Curated annotation (Swiss-Prot):
Region annotation Disordered: where it falls in the sequence: 307-329
GO cellular component, one term: cytosol
Protein name: UDP-N-acetylenolpyruvoylglucosamine reductase
Cofactor: FAD
Compartments, record wording: Cytoplasm
UniProt xrefs under InterPro entries: FAD-bd_PCMH, FAD-bd_PCMH-like_sf, FAD-bd_PCMH_sub1, FAD-bd_PCMH_sub2, MurB, MurB_C, MurB_C_sf, Oxid_FAD_bind_N
Keyword RNA-binding: no
Keywords, sorted A to Z: Cell cycle, Cell division, Cell shape, Cell wall biogenesis/degradation, Cytoplasm, FAD, Flavoprotein, NADP, Oxidoreductase, Peptidoglycan synthesis
Family: Belongs to the MurB family.
Residue numbers annotated as active site: 172, 221, 291
Source organism (scientific name): Anaeromyxobacter dehalogenans (strain 2CP-1 / ATCC BAA-258)
Function field: Cell wall formation.
Gene Ontology molecular function: any one: UDP-N-acetylmuramate dehydrogenase activity
Keyword Flavoprotein: yes
Length: 329
């Protein structure tokens, strides 16, 4: 029995072998996963975490595919993708608990249905709630740390809620315990003017459509903004707006967005990222930090010149191991 057979035997849920990942990412780039798993519930999720630990198989987490670049060679081991409908969602007064695999849009929809506001910054942000919570997603209107009260974390030993105050929330990041996966997200909002909230979110979506290249595949912002600066302005200032490598391009619309013109490779994308980092460092003395998570087997030369955040390959509640799995048959 192969490790893929063993995981399918132990873990209730959906198991897809050699699953294409490019269609499951926003930028539409990358190779397949040895095994893509969608556990049926929290117990199945913990069973999966136990299985990969005991079998020595790497585990990575894929949310909605935003802010993620998958290697052209794909991802060895197991890629976990939580189903959108995960048991245990609830609403109690001003507190909502939602599945980490749910689309971000579910939170404002559920909140508005109960007369709650306070999450207007989520208007137009793609991805899943788990990914948003792990990366502290946000805009000028606010960020996830403003509303998250607790995260339910799954480990090989079970699941439990951890207060947000213990997770070291900071700009576009938080500190999850090693090996933990976000299963559910608890947020606290407040009663308010739902119509005004909807109008503000609609305005933010329209602003994004007018200023960002959302008509092409893109993983979103490539770099975080340095203090007092805008990454897009820096990339444009060094002459890279509209610069193309292969079928990937620094967008002529917004210079902090790499877009896929059709058939782009991860290598094309990383060439653009490395070039921008080098030029901005040389001209301005600023080391741009990527907001993009790398997933899979990249060539060392493709990772050269990237910051540690990207090269580490961590992710939204991901337990990412360096152990090469047995032959995936």
């Amino acid at each position: 029995m192969t490790w893929r057979d063993e995981i399918a035997r132990r873990v209730r849920g959906e198991h897809l072998r050699d699953a294409p990942l490019a269609p499951r990412t926003a930028v539409r780039v990358g190779g397949p996963a040895d095994l893509l798993c969608r556990p049926a519930d929290g117990d199945a999720l913990s069973a999966l975490l136990r299985a990969v630990r005991e079998l020595g198989v790497p585990l990575s987490v894929l949310g909605g595919g935003a802010n993620t670049l998958v290697a052209d060679a794909g991802v060895r081991g197991v890629v976990l993708r939580l189903p959108q409908e995960f048991p245990g969602e609830s609403t109690d007064g001003d507190t909502l608990v939602l599945s980490a695999g749910a689309p971000i849009s579910r939170l404002p929809a559920r909140a508005h249905a109960h007369g709650l506001v306070g999450m207007e910054f989520l208007g137009g942000i793609p991805g899943t709630l788990g990914g948003a919570a792990a990366m502290n997603a946000g805009t000028r209107l606010g960020e996830m740390k403003d509303v998250v009260t607790r995260l339910e974390l799954a480990t090989p030993d079970g699941t439990g809620f951890v207060p947000a105050s213990a997770l070291g929330y900071a700009y576009r990041t938080c500190r999850l315990p090693p090996g933990a996966v976000i299963a559910r997200v608890e947020v606290r909002l407040h009663p308010g003017d739902v119509a005004a909230s909807e109008a503000l979110m609609r305005e933010d979506r329209e602003r994004r459509r007018a200023t960002q290249p959302l008509y092409r595949p893109t993983f979103g912002s490539t770099f975080t903004n340095p203090p007092g600066e805008y990454a897009g302005r820096l990339v444009e200032a060094v002459g890279l707006k509209g610069h193309r490598v292969g079928n990937a391009i620094w967008s002529p619309v917004h210079a902090n967005f790499v877009t896929n013109l059709g058939g782009a490779t991860a290598r094309d994308v990383l060439a653009l990222v490395r070039l921008a980092r080098a030029r901005v460092q040389e001209r301005f003395g600023i080391a741009l930090e990527t907001e993009v998570r790398l997933l899979g087997e990249f060539l060392e030369e493709d990772l050269e010149g990237l910051d540690g955040h990207a090269a580490a390959g961590g992710g939204p509640g991901a337990a990412s191991g360096g152990v090469r799995p047995p032959e995936a048959t």
